[in-house]
From Swiss-Prot:
GO terms for biological process: exocytosis; positive regulation of calcium ion-dependent exocytosis; positive regulation of cytokine production; protein transport. This is Secretory carrier-associated membrane protein 5A. It is a multi-pass membrane protein. Residues 1-39, 89-102, 170-235 are cytoplasmic. Keywords: Cell membrane, Cytoplasmic vesicle, Endosome, Exocytosis, Golgi apparatus, Membrane, Protein transport, Synapse, Transmembrane, Transmembrane helix, Transport. The chain crosses the membrane at residues 40-60, 68-88, 103-125, 149-169. Residues 61-67, 126-148 are extracellular. The keyword Lipid metabolism does not apply. It is found in: Cell membrane; Golgi apparatus membrane; Golgi apparatus, trans-Golgi network membrane; Recycling endosome membrane.
Amino acid sequence: MSDKPNNFPPLPRFIPLKPCFYQDFDTDIPDLHRTTAKRLYYLWMLNSITLGVNLIGCLAWLIGGGSATNFGLAFLWLILFTPCSYVCWFRPIYKAFKTDSSFNFMAFFFTFTAQLVISIIQAVGIPGWGVCGWIASISFFGTNVGSAVVMLIPTIMFTAVAVLSFVALTKVHRFYRGAGGSLSKAQEEWTTGAWKNPHVQQAAQNAAFGATQGAMTQNEPQYSATPNYGYSNEM
């Protein structure tokens, strides 16, 4: 087990709560996967920001004559989905890249697919569901144009999150299958308990780092001897 103190989320000192997770892309994630892991983290941040903007959009919806139910649900989605999405799909893919764990990859695919479906529903925007999607925003133009324009901002952001989520899911799945991952490997990890064994995880992490360094070494030009370019010594 790592003795490093938890550093995420970075809470102010006056809050009587401590960080729950340790997160360091440079030390935990191999170079080969670091960019993808960071992009998924940025996607989680974009999704969280979108939920906050959606709350503002639902407030404009309420001021323009909409239902208070939408504002209440928007607040609920913000405080519920922000931490749950981090725990349910970002942490599994973070640990999957860190330890090359098939079980965590499968956990990510399952929860992130649900995240994708939710993002599509949010982009559609069914009235009364607490989201400013396309249906809710466009239909409200006949009631209050100003509020509808504000509602379009989270609508566009929800659409972007849905598109980026689909791209991310496709990319990670292509990598996983290309690396030889399968459901049977995930089931084997679950049966043997390797997915939660810290010693196995550390060994897998070391192997992943070693494989990455080996691939980088192979890509470097190799010279059997100092090259001689035949320059003349005559002046």
